[in-house]
Amino acid sequence: MTPNKAKRRLADNMRERRLSFNLTQTGLSERSGVALSTLRKFEQCGAISIDNLFKLMLVLGGLDEMIEASALKTSGFSSIDEVLSGKETPKRKRGSRS
């Protein structure tokens, strides 16, 4: 998925959420503190700052799920035998030099 397609899909999803709550753009703007012009632009072309997106998601829901989806998923050991056999070695937590 391209960034533009992702922005468009996110904007469509948020518009559907707004409508499912039976909120007008003006109503959502007032509840979230996001300017009406910003909300309109977001729903039309997907452009929005992360701060304003978070404000909208606080009102419409989904912020916790978005934060959880961005978390690093690590696979732990499933048994003591895996720990003792050393199948998984600790990963370095440093970035590489460019």
Describe every region a protein language model picked out.
Residues C45-L58:
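Short, basic-rich loop-to-helix N-cap that marks the start of a DNA-contacting helix
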Residues M1-R9:
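A detector for short, charged/polar N-terminal pre-domain segments
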Residues D12-G27, K87-S96:
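Short basic helix-loop element that most often maps to the first helix and adjoining turn
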Residues S20, R31, C45-I48:
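Helix-turn-helix/winged-helix DNA-binding modules
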Residues N22-R40:
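Short alpha-helical DNA-recognition segment
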Residues I67-S98:
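Short, charged recognition helix plus adjacent turn
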Residues R8-A11, R15, M57:
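Short amphipathic alpha-helical segments with heptad-repeat character
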